[in-house]
A protein has these predicted regions:
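Short, charged beta->alpha transition segments
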Residues: 102-106
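Gly/Pro-rich, low-complexity intrinsically disordered segments
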Residues: 1-30
Length: 233
């Protein structure tokens, strides 16, 4: 799913604590980029059949393509962006019985350090964040059939998943380590060249290249994990 970036010359500005001066329609599909350096994106109602990508060619702070599906309402306040879908029962039936109708693409600006937070869970979602900078990732409500492509970390970056994870794939730069903590047991874990069938209870593992104080990812899963893969890109 392609989104053509809009032309919007950018200038260097410090991180803003007040809304950018440009106005935008909260029912539109784009938010102009205005020099922001850090943003938090929150999707409070869950997400399915979607991709979220940091695009090196993006000119907007955020752009959304929903095909024929319902569009979210955008809320922008200082360093906070929130996307809210107003689902009606008829929309839900249409999405269920029409394959591909609910596919969503969310494109983010590459010059921003992003914190992303999902509530309500993720299902069949691709998060390609490899071309940007990420400060934190939070997923509440569990996730299933999710692929997460990570950029080089600038610090120790937490990834928190509550509600369990199944069919979760994580790719990171070859030189980047990942620490893993799981509460609730693991079934079918692939950690680079290592494979484990099952671990009961709580587990603490890492990729073998995690050093205290050196930038890496810290993945914590509450609620158990099944078919979890962590590999180098």
């Amino acid at each position: 799913m392609m989104i053509n970036p809009t032309s919007d010359p950018t200038t260097d500005h410090p991180y803003r604590t007040a809304p950018p001066p440009r106005t935008f329609d909260p029912d539109s599909s784009r938010v102009p980029y205005d020099g922001q350096t850090r943003m938090r994106l929150t999707i409070p109602s869950g997400l399915a059949h979607a991709c979220v990508v940091i695009d090196p060619a993006a000119r907007d702070l955020l752009a959304i393509e929903c095909g024929d599906g319902p569009r979210p309402r955008i809320r922008l306040a200082g360093g906070e962006l929130a996307l809210t879908w107003r689902h009606l029962f008829g929309d839900w039936l249409r999405d269920v019985f029409t394959p591909g109708l609910g596919d969503v693409a969310i494109v983010l600006h590459p010059a921003v350090e992003w914190t992303v937070a999902f509530r309500g869970g993720l299902s069949r979602v691709e998060l390609d964040l490899s071309a940007g900078t990420v400060a934190r990732i939070d997923i509440a409500g569990g996730c299933s059939h999710v692929l997460l492509d990570l950029p080089p970390p600038a610090a120790v970056v937490p990834i928190r998943i509550s509600g369990g994870a199944s069919h979760l794939g994580i790719r990171r730069p070859a030189e980047t380590g990942v620490g893993l903590g799981v509460a609730g047991g693991i079934a079918m874990l692939r950690l680079d060249d290592r494979s484990l069938d099952a671990i009961g209870g709580a587990a603490q593992l890492d990729t073998g290249d995690v050093t205290r104080g050196v930038p890496h990812y810290e993945l914590t899963i509450a609620g158990g994990a099944s078919d979890l893969s962590i590999e180098r890109r």
